C-alpha cells in the first residue's frame, strides 16, 4: 500500500522538519539574547547542535546534493573546535537550568564542591556488586 511504501520517507521528512524548526527557532532566540557573553556561549551550543544534526543525517544531505564532501569534512573539524570552545562554559550552562545533581544523575556539578568524592560514594552505594558480602 501507499502507506507502506511512503512510511519511511514520511517519518524521515517529519523528523527533518522537526529538526529544521528547532534549529531555526534556536537561532532566532539566540540572536535575541542581549548579554554578549550569554549570546556567544549559547551561539556556540546552537552551532554545535545544528552541525550535529547535519552530521547525524548526512546521508540525506548527500543524497540531495545539499552538501559536498569538502563541506562535510569542514563541519566535522568545526565540531571538534566547538567542543573545545564550549567545554569551559559547559558546567555554567548546565547549572544555569538549576537542575539538581540528583535529577541529572551526576555529581560533576556538586554544589558542595566535592564532585569526585560524591562520584566515588555513588559508585560504592549504587550497585550491590560494590557492597561487601555479609556472611552469617
Where are these regions (language model features)?
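Flavin-dependent oxidoreductase catalytic core characteristic
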Residues: 1-136
